[in-house]
Amino acid sequence: MGRRTVLAAGLGAFLPPAPAASNTPGEREVAQSIEGAHEEMFRRFLDPEYGTTYDYAPPGGTPLLPTPQECRELKPNALAWWSPIENGGFFGGLYLSALSDRFRLARSAANEQGARRVASGLVRLARAGGTPGFIARGVSTDGLTHFPASSSDQTFPWFYGMTAYLMSGIVKGNEKRELVRLMEEVADGLQRNAWRMPCDRAGFGHFGDWLGAFSDANTTLTGAEPHFDAASRLLFVHLALYRLTGKRAWLDLYRQRRDERPGEAARSRLEICAQGVEYAPPGTPARYPDHPPLWTSASSQAALLGLLRMEPDPGARSHYRKGLDANAARAARYVDRYQGFNNLDQSAFEHDWRFLNELWRPQSSIQDAVRLATTQVREWHKRSPRKVYECDFVRDPLFAAWIVNLAGNRASTAPARSQVLKALTHYRWSCLHTSHFFMAECVYYSGRTHAHLSKP
């Protein structure tokens, strides 16, 4: 039996009933499309030596990585924004969760090897820095040098992916214990820093805050968290560490954090999770703290699913179930944006990001770095309209589809499920410049593994 046949087997639980005249893609067509996406990701968007994930690469070549010297000099900026190594923790962590599901569904040596390769990249990102709790975004050509700024959007997917990997059955014994210890070391470092995501340079500040969330003092210049994202991510990490370590202290801290009201909030974190989040419509600016971008907040929907599956208390579970359903219904309206993508589009994508150094200036804090990167993005988008095009019509609909699928087969999102399948078969993966389409595998495998979640 071939790999594609194995992948297609059992997909029926994911497919919605469709009339004979429907043009909804069938099981085999979807499975073949996903296998094509998988092959393209491994061909172009994973570092062949270090296993880290690239943001973009030319269809026929490899990306231009920042040199170690450029990383040390903070070029193009300390956040690595607009470079090919901007989102290694973010994309790699979520991709590892999909590869872990892929292995559980088809326990082959090839699937194990693929997951191990991405996991090795995530381990490298956790060990690259010298600051406790720091997760690097990516590494330079030497496999070690990195930009100093991390973020919540890098850190939480790292935890989520490593949790999925450690629960997949791929790693056992001493190897598993070592990786659990690494996760706990990262969490301990964050806890000592009041759950703020530190920069790996003394005095540079932090970028992300799971306790303080958004306030007059915490703004987008310090990576302040929307309340929903901060609450769901913080709770997931605590409960996952309890499940992995068996240490009662993590469970006690989880229950304390779950029931307390953060800062001046009128609601507990559990109540914040139940409300979910109103995503900023794709193609429009985010409005923090209550309307974050759909794609950066999507991993918080995965946090809710993890909490639903790990939480022993039925009352708390019902809150997580409510949040999952609310987010899925809100995201469902954006899945059909895939229709705006034309596979024959030839708009420009500038892969040599070094033109951004013309706007470069020294940075002594995370605030300086955010201001510089915000200035650079205007020129980046002028030179690379194709990048914006793929964000609008590849990234956003696929992340929306993932949010829908993470909630399981729910009546409220039934109309979107046909659009999810059409999105998975719409793209010609080999013509894409960005790696956002890794999310197609997340969508597919979440649909297969979580479709049964029809009851609280």
What are these regions (language model features)?
Residues G51-P84, T131-S151, C199-P226, I272-M310, ...:
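Carbohydrate-binding/catalytic loop surfaces
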Residues S150-L239:
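Aromatic- and glycine-enriched pocket-lining scaffold segments that form the walls
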Residues A230-H319, N327, W360:
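Long, repeat-rich segments with strong aromatic
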